[in-house]
């Protein structure tokens, strides 16, 4: 008897998600669920049918998102119930952070916790009234089943509509509070920055690294603040703990998203572009400050990982690698001692495999489900085997023959900007031409392929299609990245592009009444509320990045309006930053820059020549968080910092200005270094 195809003998056509660009949404295109993407069509369908909306939010590298899909969304009975009683909507949180942030805040307020997959129930106007995260197919560990939750919602929707309306109204009012935060009518207070930094240092885990208890996320912005403020001890502990832990891919480079435990051993294995861009930059700054070559190595291995495994043909970077392969979390990255020996057969001298096994703490019984997450138990004190580099290359080749984790190959504007900035800084500091070339290619991709016909940024790109209006973080990160690229290359087109982007950001997102910036543009589709992106976790908020970028522009141009807009952000949040320094660490970095006596360095070459390399390397080679840099031939008028400056006796000259006064120009790198180090 022939086997019947699924769904009662009929071959099911893909659902509405088949036309989307998000790899996460495309993963659900063959579900029997009648999914809608977020948009007016879905909301109108809910109003027409008087059904509640079942909103499911996730992302492609999310392990539990995949689990819930297998258990519930691929189940025909569950799907039939969803289709009959709800209007189901699927959202990729990375493409639509505006939607995700609203409903994540709502669920956290209702349940006290959040995460992905996010499951929320909304009225036809999009107002949430109930929600949670992952729900199992059967009752488990005190959790109701997904079917039980849906049935309870349907019952309440049918018989207790007045209660639902009251709950929705209350939640909507609470959600709007973030956008209504008023700026404190006071001057910025330097002592608050000192207090916040002191608090951050006091909560650092000086034994295991990081802050707080498990799970631990890489705290890049917090470490940047501590480095800028000269508190290097907690930075060193954390950088070592992560670099030698299981959260770092000891064979292929790059960091996983977070550690499940408090010792950085067991990661959640997905690799995100944004984490690795931020951490490459932090390890670069750690090397520049502390001089440890191991930090330079981690920085470079992380960037090489991004260039090797995450770069698209047009110069942009993919978003993430999944945690799972072959249906198991972390399988691609795990090892047994026997596999290590097999990979190293014929490599190096006799006994190298035993040395590598010992160095990486691999045991017969394993440390994760019978296999081993490679780490370095001895940390910085452990002497690596003499042939470790050859061994790692052989193990990488061996591992590459395994089934790879899935790749989310959409290119997000903001995350690409983070990687462009990291490559630009590293390329200038190390120095490395390959990194600079990659940074330029990445910036050209953004400027060419992620803007519309009016010059406005677009959020996402895949398969030669860019779409969705960009958000505040996209504009703010692009400003920071292009300024970093200008300082690394002195190519004035990147300064011009940064300024153009900043001006457009102010026009589209600024809150002229209360200060700061909204997450969405003034002409964005109307959602339940219009929020402000404020927290720097796990990535810098749009407001923090906007403030920092505008301050750097103000220093390069002398344009006070940029500084005024940045101060508006600080006035919103300076009191909160004292109480929650880790959550607002990038904001505090911006405040540190504001309160510091910033040194403005202008390098001038003879007209038609260059010759700035030696002077520029003095500035670029060190970690200088309170310096801005401009350079170009005599007669250049952009940035304004270069205007009316000339060479000295025909030789390239460096001008250092601070507190509205400039020192005499110098021509020798040693003299410039002495001036910067005063």
Residue spans for each PLM region:
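Replace the tail clause
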Residues: 4-429, 461, 570-678
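Extended, hydrophobic alpha-helical segments in both membrane/secreted and soluble proteins
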Residues: 58-65, 251, 255, 279, ...
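Glycine-rich, acidic and aromatic/proline-enriched surface loops and short helix-turn segments
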Residues: 241-248, 441-449
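Inter-helical turn/loop segments and adjacent helix faces that build the functional surface
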Residues: 286-294, 426-433, 485-489, 553-563
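Long, polar/charge-rich, low-hydrophobicity segments
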Residues: 308-311, 448-476, 481-637
């Amino acid at each position: 008897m022939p086997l019947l195809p699924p769904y009662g003998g009929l071959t099911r056509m893909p659902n509405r998600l088949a036309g989307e660009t998000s790899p996460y949404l495309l993963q659900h295109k063959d579900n029997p669920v009648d999914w809608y993407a977020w948009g007016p069509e879905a909301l109108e369908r809910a109003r027409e049918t008087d059904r509640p909306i079942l909103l499911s939010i996730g992302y492609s590298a999310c392990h539990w998102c995949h689990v819930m899909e297998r258990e519930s969304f691929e189940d025909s009975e569950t799907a039939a119930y969803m289709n009959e009683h709800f209007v189901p909507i699927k959202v990729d949180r990375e493409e639509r952070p505006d939607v995700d942030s609203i409903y994540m805040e709502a669920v956290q307020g209702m349940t006290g916790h959040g995460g992905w997959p996010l499951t929320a129930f909304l009225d036809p106007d999009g107002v949430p009234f109930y929600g949670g995260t992952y729900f199992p197919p059967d009752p488990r560990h005190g959790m109701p089943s997904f079917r039980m939750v849906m049935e309870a919602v349907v019952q309440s929707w049918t018989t207790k509509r007045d209660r639902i309306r009251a709950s929705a109204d209350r939640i909507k009012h609470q959600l709007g509070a973030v956008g209504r935060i008023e700026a404190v009518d006071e001057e910025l207070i330097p002592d608050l920055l000192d207090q916040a930094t002191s608090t951050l240092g006091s909560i650092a885990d000086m034994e295991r690294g990081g802050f707080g208890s498990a799970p631990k996320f890489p705290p890049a912005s917090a470490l940047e603040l501590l480095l800028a403020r000269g508190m290097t001890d907690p930075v060193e502990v954390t950088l070592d703990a992560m670099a030698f832990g299981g959260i770092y891919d000891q064979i292929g480079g790059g960091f996983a998203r977070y550690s499940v435990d408090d010792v950085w051993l067991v990661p959640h294995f997905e690799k995100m572009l944004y984490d690795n861009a931020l951490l490459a930059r932090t390890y670069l700054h750690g090397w520049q400050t502390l001089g440890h070559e191991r930090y330079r190595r981690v920085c470079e291995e992380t960037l090489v990982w991004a260039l090797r495994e995450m770069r698209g043909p047009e110069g942009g970077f993919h978003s993430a690698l999944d945690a799972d392969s072959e249906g198991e979390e972390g399988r691609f990255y795990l090892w047994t001692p026997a596999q290590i020996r097999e990979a190293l057969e014929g490599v190096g001298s006799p006994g190298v495999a035993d040395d590598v096994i010992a160095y990486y703490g691999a045991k017969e019984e394993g440390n994760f489900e019978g296999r081993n997450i490679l780490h370095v138990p001895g940390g910085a004190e452990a002497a690596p085997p003499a042939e470790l580099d050859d061994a790692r290359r052989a193990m990488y080749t061996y591992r590459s023959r395994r089934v790879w984790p899935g790749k989310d190959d959409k290119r997000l504007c903001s995350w690409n900007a983070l990687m462009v900035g990291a490559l630009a800084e590293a390329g200038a500091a190390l120095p490395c031409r390959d990194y600079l070339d990659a940074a330029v290619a990445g910036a050209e991709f953004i400027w060419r392929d992620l803007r519309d016909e009016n010059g406005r940024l677009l959020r996402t790109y895949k398969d030669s299609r860019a779409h969705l209006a960009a958000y505040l973080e996209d504009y703010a990160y692009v400003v920071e990245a292009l300024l970093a690229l200008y300082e690394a290359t002195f190519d004035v087109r990147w300064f011009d592009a940064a300024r153009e982007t900043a001006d457009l950001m102010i026009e589209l997102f600024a809150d002229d009444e209360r200060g700061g910036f909204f997450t969405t543009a003034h002409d964005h589709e109307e959602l339940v509320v219009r929020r402000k992106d404020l927290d720097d976790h796990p990535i810098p908020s749009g407001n923090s990045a906007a403030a920092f970028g505008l301050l750097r522009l103000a220093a390069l141009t002398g344009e006070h309006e940029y500084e005024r807009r940045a101060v508006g952000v600080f006035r919103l949040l300076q009191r909160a930053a004292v109480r929650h320094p880790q959550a607002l660490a990038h904001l505090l970095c911006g405040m540190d820059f504001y309160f510091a006596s910033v040194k403005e360095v202008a390098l001038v070459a003879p007209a038609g020549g260059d010759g700035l390399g030696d002077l520029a390397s003095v500035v670029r080679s060190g970690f200088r968080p309170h310096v801005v840099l401009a350079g170009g031939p005599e007669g250049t008028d952009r940035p304004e910092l270069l205007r009316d400056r000339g060479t000295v006796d025909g030789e390239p000259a460096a001008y250092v200005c601070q507190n509205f006064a400039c020192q005499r120009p110098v021509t020798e790198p040693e003299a410039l270094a002495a001036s910067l180090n005063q």
